[in-house]
C-alpha cells in the first residue's frame, strides 16, 4: 500500500485532492494510506515524529510560513524521503522554480481527475 501525503493550507483543496484519489481507488481497485497536512511545518514535524515514508506528496506552494518549495527542499535532504515523488499543486505561473527539487509534476490548481489519475498510474508503475 502506498503512502500519500497532501499538504495545503486550504482544507477545501486537500479534500478535493483526496476525493480524486478515492475515486481512483474505486476505479482501479487499489488502496492508499492518505495523510493530510495544513502546513509544511506540520508535515515535517510528522515526518520527524513518526516512521512514515511517503511514496507521493502533493504540495501546495503558497502556504503561510514554509512554502511548498521550502518544504520539498527539506524533504529531499532526508535519506528516507529522497525517492519520494513530489507533485506541486499550485496557482503559480512560473513552474521553473520547482525544478530544483525534481518534482514528478507541477499541476495547476485545482487539478483534474484525469491529471491525478495519470500521476497515480505513474507512481504505481514506478513502485511495481
Which residues make up each language-model segment?
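Conserved acidic segment of CheY-like receiver
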Residues: 2-21
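Active-site residues of response regulator receiver
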Residues: 8, 59-61
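Acidic, metal-coordinating helix/loop segments flanking the phosphotransfer/catalytic sites
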Residues: 36-56
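Acidic catalytic/metal-coordinating carboxylates
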Residues: 39, 67-70
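Short amphipathic alpha-helix used as the core "switch/output" element in two-component signaling
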Residues: 45, 69-82
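His-Asp phosphorelay/catalytic-motif detector in bacterial-type signaling
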Residues: 52-55, 79-85
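Alpha4 helix (beta4-alpha4-beta5 surface) of REC/receiver domains from two-component response regulators
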Residues: 70, 83, 91-108, 113-118
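The C-terminal output helix
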Residues: 121-128
Amino acid at each position: 500500500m502506498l503512502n500519500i501525503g497532501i499538504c495545503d493550507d486550504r482544507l477545501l483543496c486537500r479534500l478535493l485532492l483526496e476525493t480524486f484519489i478515492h475515486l481512483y481507488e474505486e476505479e482501479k481497485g487499489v488502496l492508499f494510506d492518505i495523510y493530510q497536512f495544513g502546513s509544511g511545518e506540520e508535515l515535517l514535524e510528522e515526518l520527524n515524529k513518526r516512521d512514515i515514508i511517503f511514496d507521493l506528496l502533493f504540495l501546495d506552494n503558497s502556504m503561510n510560513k514554509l512554502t511548498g518549495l521550502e518544504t520539498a527542499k527539506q524533504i529531499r535532504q532526508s535519506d528516507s524521503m529522497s525517492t519520494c515523488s513530489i507533485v506541486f499543486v499550485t496557482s503559480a505561473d512560473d513552474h521553473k522554480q520547482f525544478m530544483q527539487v525534481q518534482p514528478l509534476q507541477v499541476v495547476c490548481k485545482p487539478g483534474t481527475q484525469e491529471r491525478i489519475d495519470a500521476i497515480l498510474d505513474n507512481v504505481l508503475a514506478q513502485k511495481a
